[in-house]
């Protein structure tokens, strides 16, 4: 499921897919179920999501991802 009904912002399938991909990749890196769940918590607005961005070397696109988080 790409869309989290708890998110109250704009529904944009492309943004959700992009944010969800970060969490999927982070889970694949660590293989810990709590990583995937925590990463998606609070509509991606959390420390685990930000740490995943850094661990996946997506830091140079950090602002773009955070903007997506604020949108959803």
Curated annotation (Swiss-Prot):
GO-annotated biological processes: circadian rhythm; glucose metabolic process; neuropeptide signaling pathway
Positions bearing D-phenylalanine: 3
Superkingdom: Eukaryota
Coiled coil ranges: none
Pfam families from the UniProt entry: Crust_neurohorm
Keyword Disulfide bond included in the entry's annotation: yes
Residues bearing the modification Pyrrolidone carboxylic acid: 1
A GO term for molecular function: neuropeptide hormone activity
Keyword Cell cycle found: no
Keywords, in A-Z order: Amidation, Carbohydrate metabolism, D-amino acid, Disulfide bond, Glucose metabolism, Hormone, Neuropeptide, Pyrrolidone carboxylic acid, Secreted
Disulphides: 7-43, 23-39, 26-52
Subcellular location per the Swiss-Prot or TrEMBL entry: Secreted
UniProt modified residues of type Valine amide: 72
Family: Belongs to the arthropod CHH/MIH/GIH/VIH hormone family.
Primary role: Hormone found in the sinus gland of isopods and decapods which controls the blood sugar level. Has a secretagogue action over the amylase released from the midgut gland. May act as a stress hormone and may be involved in the control of molting and reproduction.
Protein name as catalogued: Crustacean hyperglycemic hormone A
Organism listed in the record: Cherax destructor (Common yabby crayfish)
């Amino acid at each position: 499921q790409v869309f989290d009904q708890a998110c109250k912002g704009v529904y944009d399938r492309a943004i959700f897919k992009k944010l969800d991909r970060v969490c999927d990749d982070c889970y694949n890196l660590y293989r810990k179920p709590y990583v995937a769940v925590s990463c998606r918590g609070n509509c991606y607005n959390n420390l685990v999501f930000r740490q995943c961005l850094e661990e996946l070397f997506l830091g140079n696109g950090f602002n773009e991802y955070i903007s997506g988080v604020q949108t959803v």
